[in-house]
């Protein structure tokens, strides 16, 4: 598992209080992990801070799953 995946999982577990076993690549923040719209905004802000990347609103609106977040961060960090 990549460093990005581990760090994203850690942020999600800390912010949403979910079991790490539920934080899998295709898990939806809202449908599978119980996040609401405020939670998703806070997750995006936490990802930006942790990885030193900017996630524009347009991009944030396309990040629905753990895998989406990892792909965006890896691409933005490259």
Curated annotation (Swiss-Prot):
GO terms for biological process: lipid A biosynthetic process. InterPro entries: ACP, ACP-like_sf, PKS_PP-bd, PP-bd_ACP, Ppantetheine_attach_site. GO terms for molecular function: acyl binding; acyl carrier activity; phosphopantetheine binding. Residues 2-77 form the Carrier domain. Pathway: Lipid metabolism; fatty acid biosynthesis. The keyword Lyase does not apply. It holds the Pfam family PP-binding. It comes from the Bacteria. It is found in: Cytoplasm. Keywords: Cytoplasm, Fatty acid biosynthesis, Fatty acid metabolism, Lipid biosynthesis, Lipid metabolism, Phosphopantetheine, Phosphoprotein. The modification O-(pantetheine 4'-phosphoryl)serine is found at residue 37. Signal peptide: none annotated. SUPFAM superfamilies: ACP-like. One of its GO terms (cellular component) is cytosol. Belongs to the acyl carrier protein (ACP) family. Carrier of the growing fatty acid chain in fatty acid biosynthesis. This is Acyl carrier protein. It comes from Bartonella tribocorum (strain CIP 105476 / IBS 506).
